[in-house]
């Protein structure tokens, strides 16, 4: 498949990345965040990923199942914005994958993710971190 044909296929069906297995994938479950970090793509001017209408949880769960089954995805990385704003969705979707992972700012707590990976984003010691985080 060419880049153009992949793009056209994805526009028709968001789970169509060709007839290929992908061991790992990532998804931004939301572009909403409770912080306003100076370096974050969510808060850049003219960001095409800015917060807007979200996919409802049931639809997103179906998409996760389709992606897992269609592309044999074993590991899923949940990102955002702040993915734990949609904690119920993320924790339920994490059960679908052998190796779930979450990137979080930990302001909603650090989730328990047995068999998975939780990455907490920090920008240095408190005196450096806090001004960056807004």
Question: Which residue stretches match the model-derived regions?
Answer:
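A short alpha-helix capping/helix-coil boundary motif
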Residues: 6-7, 42-43, 125-126
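Radical SAM enzyme core and accessory elements
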Residues: 1-19
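A short, structure-level motif marking secondary-structure boundaries and short turns
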Residues: 11-12, 48-50, 75, 130
């Amino acid at each position: 498949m060419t880049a153009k044909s992949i793009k056209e296929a994805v526009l028709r069906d968001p789970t169509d990345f060709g007839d290929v297995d992908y061991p790992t994938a990532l998804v931004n479950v939301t572009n909403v965040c409770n912080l306003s970090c100076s370096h974050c793509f969510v808060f850049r001017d003219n960001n095409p990923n800015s917060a807007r209408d979200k996919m409802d949880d049931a639809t997103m769960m179906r998409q996760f199942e389709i992606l897992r089954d269609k592309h044999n995805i074993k590991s899923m990385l949940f990102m955002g914005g702040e993915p734990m704003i949609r904690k119920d969705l993320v924790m339920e979707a994490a059960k679908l994958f052998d190796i779930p992972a979450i990137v979080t700012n930990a302001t909603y707590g650090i989730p328990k993710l047995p068999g998975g990976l939780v990455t907490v984003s920090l920008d240095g010691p408190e005196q450096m971190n806090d001004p960056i985080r807004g």
